[in-house]
Structure formats: C-alpha cells, structure tokens
Design a protein with these regions (language model features):
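Pyridoxal 5′-phosphate
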Residues: 1-134
C-alpha cells in the first residue's frame, strides 16, 4: 500500500469541513444564481442567502449588517484593507509599516501604494524571523 502524501499547504487552502459542504451543496446544484442578478428567481434566492449570511455574521460580531463585507479570499481582503487604510488616512500621511517576511498578498499592495506616493517601511527580520524592536 502506498503511503498517503502529507499536505503542508493548509495556510493556502484546506479541506472543506463536511458540514460546510452539506450547507453549501444546494448553492452549487440548485440555487446557483448570481446574487447581483435579481431579475430572476435564482439570483433572488442567492441574494437572500448572502443577506442572511451577512446578518448572521453581523449578529456574531455585534455589528451592523451593512458593515460586513464578503471577499473572494485573503488576497482580495488584504488589498481592500491596505488600500482602505491608506485612503482613510490620506490626510495624516500614508505611511505603512510591514515586515520583510510578510506574504506577497500584503507586500504587493504595499509596493503599489508606494508607487502611488505612499511611504512604506519594510522592517528586516533576523535569522529566526524576528523583528528587532530597536
């Protein structure tokens, strides 16, 4: 019997929990509309599902539903967060600080912000990946 491979890339993607698969299955097979296309029943059902999910997350976080934003994944989330902070703080100056070991999904938007006139400081790390606080 061949040994099963060991999967060491869970930080990028993981096996989907069977409970999530069961909950999502109807949206892959029966209610597969685009929630932005509300001119048909499939889109309306998808929008209702997204609205319900947003309300559930908002309740868990004690936040207004209109402050909950879903993204396609980590890269989009990182871009949105970094660009949003830079835009919101434009009057105070756009200086972001990150570390050299940060993920490409953070370093790339930082580089873009720098090309657009923002100030980016990338802190080096030592051999153990630690930032020297001095």
């Amino acid at each position: 019997m061949a040994a099963l491979p060991i999967y060491l890339d869970n930080h990028a993607t993981t096996r989907t929990d069977p409970r999530v698969v069961a909950a999502m299955l109807p949206y892959f097979t029966d209610i597969y509309g685009n929630p932005s296309s509300t001119n048909h029943v499939f889109g309306q059902a998808a929008l209702a599902a997204v609205t319900s999910a947003r309300e559930q997350v908002a309740r868990l976080l004690h936040a207004p539903p209109n402050t909950i934003l879903f993204t396609s994944g980590a890269t989009e989330s990182n871009n949105l967060a970094l660009k949003g902070v830079a835009a919101a703080q434009r009057q105070r100056g756009r200086h972001l600080i990150t570390v050299a070991t940060e993920h490409k999904a953070v370093l790339d938007p930082c580089a873009r912000l720098q090309r657009d006139g923002g100030e980016i400081t990338i802190l080096p790390v030592d051999g153990q990946g630690l930032v020297d606080p001095d």
